[in-house]
C-alpha cells in the first residue's frame, strides 16, 4: 500500500518540527493571545482602543535565502521576514500586534524548520508582537532538497487620529535617516550576480555572513518617538531604494533632496560598487546605510536625533523637502 511518506511527505517529521517550534513560539505570547498552538485559527484580543484601525503587511525574504542555503545558516532569516513586514506597517504609525509565517520546502527537516522559526520568534520579540500562527508545507518535487521559501504576515494597530499618512508634509521639512544593519533583504539577485564566492574573506569574516546580517527592526525606537513627537511621514527603505520608497510618503507637488555625504556608507556597499555597479543605480536598489526615514518639522530635528541616539540608534539629518514633482534628488 502506498503511503504519504512514499510520496515524499513525512508526517512524523512534521509533528517533530511542531514540537521543536513550540518553545520559540510561546516566548512571543502576550496578554492579547487567546489560544495556543494547534487550533484551526489564532485569536487575538485587541484591548482598549477608542477608534482603532488595523494595519496589515505581508512580505518575504527574496533571494537572500540562496546565501542561507549555501552557508547552511537558518536561524536569522526569520528575523528578516518579520522585519520586512513590521517595518512596513510601522510607516503608518502602527504598533505590531501579531505575526503569522508561511514556510514551504521540498523535504522537511525538523531541526531546520525549528531554526527558521526561532528566527521568526526572535524577530517578533524585537518587534514586540506575538507569533500566533503559521504553516509549514512539505512539497516534494516543487523545491530542491535543502531549499525552502518563507513569507510572513503582520497585523498592527493605530488609533485613527494617530495614523501617519504624509498629508502634512510641506516644503522645508527635514528627513532623518536611521542607520541600517547592512544590505537588509533587498537587492540580493543583483548581489548574487556580482559576488560569486560567499566564503571570500571580508573584514575578518566571510562575506556570506556579512550578507546574512539580519534586517534591523525599527519598531521600538520609532514607537517611542511617536509618543512625544509629531512625525509627518515615514519610509522603510526596501526594494527600489531611495528613489522608489521615499516618495511613497509625500504628495505629488514635492521633491526630496538627499545629501549622499550626510551619512556613513557601510563597507559592504562600497564593495558591491567595486564589482561594477554604478553608484546612482545602487541608490535605486539598496538602502545604502539608511534603513528607515522620518519626515519632521525642522524644530524637532535635533531632539529626535538625540532621542534615537539615546536608544542606541545611529541617526542623521539626510535631506529636506522642497517644491517639485514627486522626485528624489540625490547629490
Curated annotation (Swiss-Prot):
Gene3D superfamilies: PurM-like C-terminal domain, PurM-like, N-terminal domain. The keyword ATP-binding applies. One of its GO terms (cellular component) is cytosol. Its main location: cytoplasm. Belongs to the AIR synthase family. It catalyses: 2-formamido-N(1)-(5-O-phospho-beta-D-ribosyl)acetamidine + ATP = 5-amino-1-(5-phospho-beta-D-ribosyl)imidazole + ADP + phosphate + H(+). This is Phosphoribosylformylglycinamidine cyclo-ligase. It is found in: Cytoplasm. It holds the Pfam family AIRS. It comes from Clostridium tetani (strain Massachusetts / E88). It is an enzyme of class 6 (ligase). Its EC number is 6.3.3.1. The gene is purM. Keywords: ATP-binding, Cytoplasm, Ligase, Nucleotide-binding, Purine biosynthesis. One of its GO terms (biological process) is adenine biosynthetic process. GO terms for molecular function: ATP binding; phosphoribosylamine-glycine ligase activity; phosphoribosylformylglycinamidine cyclo-ligase activity. Pathway: Purine metabolism; IMP biosynthesis via de novo pathway; 5-amino-1-(5-phospho-D-ribosyl)imidazole from N(2)-formyl-N(1)-(5-phospho-D-ribosyl)glycinamide: step 2/2.
